[in-house]
Amino acid sequence: MRCPYCQSEDTQVKDSRPAEDGAAIRRRRVCPDCGGRFTTFERVQLRDLVVVKKSGRKVPFDRDKLLRSVEIAVRKRNVDPERIDRAVTGIVRQLESSGETEVASGEVGRLVMEALKSLDDVAYVRFASVYRNFREAKDFHELLGELKGDEDKSEEDAG
């Protein structure tokens, strides 16, 4: 693996351990040339996914972009980074196990909203405001009404 600091091709693995509930391997690496230390993750990729944008344009699926989107939604919220990573891994698994090589961007957004709903309500609302293209305060009000309705329903089911 190439060193991200000096571009040397000769790096050494110092530590390997399972990550993401066994879905990945986390490796700590060191570069003997510059002494730089960095972490890599090795994951199984079942198939190359392609995201079909609203415009019809097709782009390769990017797990890191998905992770960044979720991290932006949960920014400054008290959400354990491991829970975020598990949610992203779950979304990727759902997409890969669908059997399709192309997925609509709207489907990715729907899965993110589903995951955020169980992670953090504020992050859910933040993401929804962009995903659903909110224009007015009433859009937020309607979404909060949906959330409230879901909570009431959950309490009824539990009680």
Swiss-Prot record:
Name of protein: Transcriptional repressor NrdR
Gene transcribed to yield this protein: nrdR
Domain ATP-cone residues, every copy: 49-139
Zn-finger (unnamed) residues: 3-34
Family label: Belongs to the NrdR family.
Organism field: Mesorhizobium japonicum (strain LMG 29417 / CECT 9101 / MAFF 303099)
Entry's cofactor comment: Binds 1 zinc ion.
Needed co-factor(s): Zn(2+)
Coiled coil: none
Lineage top rank: taxon: Bacteria
Entry keyword annotation includes Transcription: yes
Disulfide bonds: none
GO BP term, pick one: negative regulation of DNA-templated transcription
Sorted UniProt keywords: ATP-binding, DNA-binding, Metal-binding, Nucleotide-binding, Repressor, Transcription, Transcription regulation, Zinc, Zinc-finger
